[in-house]
Amino acid sequence: MASSSMSTSSWTAREDKQFEMALAKFDKDTPDRWQKIARAVGGKSTEEVKRHYELLLRDVNDIESGRYPQPRYRNTN
């Protein structure tokens, strides 16, 4: 999930889930994609949805480039 530290609005866990489901439903070739995603989330503007997506992409790129260490999970054995 995208960090909200630079976002102009806060996102609830429910809104994040709706956002993720809408991204899966409306791919990059969908006409009026961002408007449809904003409607699916509800309470967010098209610009807020685009910004949230940009933050998500940046987070994914940071993780994939190794900027964040992999979590160390406790062994349960």
UniProtKB/Swiss-Prot annotation:
UniProt keyword Transcription present: yes
Annotated tissue distribution: Expressed just outside the vascular bundles in the rosette stem and the leaf traces. Not detected in floral primordia.
Keywords: Nucleus, Transcription, Transcription regulation
GO molecular function, one term: DNA-binding transcription factor activity
Localization, UniProt: Nucleus
Function: Probable transcription factor.
Miscellaneous: Assigned as a member of the MYB-related gene family, I-box-binding-like subfamily.
Name of the protein described by the UniProt record: Protein RADIALIS-like 4
Organism whose genome encodes this protein: Arabidopsis thaliana
